[in-house]
Regions:
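C-terminal helix-cap and adjacent tail motif
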Residues: 2-17, 164-199
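N-terminal amphipathic, basic helical "cap/leader" segment at the start of enzyme domains
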Residues: 1-97, 198-199
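Small-aliphatic-rich amphipathic alpha-helix that forms the alpha element of a beta-alpha
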Residues: 43, 102, 108-156
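Short secondary-structure junction motifs
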Residues: 52-55, 136, 166
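Acidic-glycine-rich active-site phosphate/pyrophosphate-binding loop
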Residues: 77, 96-109
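Short, electropositive alpha-helical surface patch
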Residues: 154-166
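Short coil/turn connectors at secondary-structure junctions
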Residues: 97-100, 139, 162-165
């Protein structure tokens, strides 16, 4: 990694320099099993209205990636019987990239007054905290969704209705320098509220 990104010298240096990596450009080493448990434990500090923990994490080890690729291919061909070679190769690549793969499920709790929307927000924050924890251990991460996150057969590999795949989080070591991407201008997303005078 370059000094420009994911500066771990302090929290106030890390946050404005945080940068994801491309999973296809991640190489070994990745987090150990002990480090992964620590990463998930850190993510448990996520804001969670009602203390519902509406999320789950499944680790897919390297020796299971071949089977995952086969299941992704099967599900894709069921949905798209005319799928081309390049589409199937992309799924194969996705299943095998990066040393570490965590699948995060949004697991809503229906027997509560807490709105599903708030539970979704908590799940997104949980994913982000996993990413921060991965970077804190001096690895790089990438959170992706795409077709597999929205296919029910893929979801059923890891969970069941009403659960949904919130994302596939990959982790490892960056193979080369990270590059910046465009960010929104601050004044586009930040403003101050002022009350309007009443007539």
């Amino acid at each position: 990694m370059t000094d420009m990104f994911n500066d771990l010298s302090s929290l106030s240096s890390y946050l404005p320099s945080r940068r994801s990596g491309r999973p296809r450009n991640m190489v070994a080493p990745g987090p150990s099993d002990e480090e992964i448990e620590s990463i998930v434990a850190i993510a448990l500090r996520t804001p969670d209205h009602g203390k519902l923990a509406p999320w789950r994490v499944i680790q897919v080890d390297k020796d299971q990636r071949g089977q995952l690729a086969a299941e992704l291919t099967k599900a894709y061909q069921t949905e798209k019987p005319d799928a081309g070679r390049l589409e199937l190769e992309a799924l194969e690549t996705m299943a095998h990239q990066a040393p570490t793969l965590l699948v995060v499920l949004f697991s809503p709790v229906t027997s509560t007054k807490i709105p599903v929307w708030e539970q979704q927000l908590s799940c997104g924050a949980f994913c982000m905290n996993i990413i921060h924890a991965i970077h804190a251990k001096d690895f790089v991460s990438g959170w992706i969704t795409g077709w597999p996150a929205y296919n029910d057969d893929v979801r059923d590999l890891f969970g069941r209705t009403p659960e949904r795949v919130a994302g596939f989080i990959f982790a490892g070591t960056a193979d080369g320098e990270l590059t910046e991407r465009p960010r929104p201008e601050l004044d586009r997303v930040f403003s101050k509220w002022k009350s309007e005078p009443h007539n």
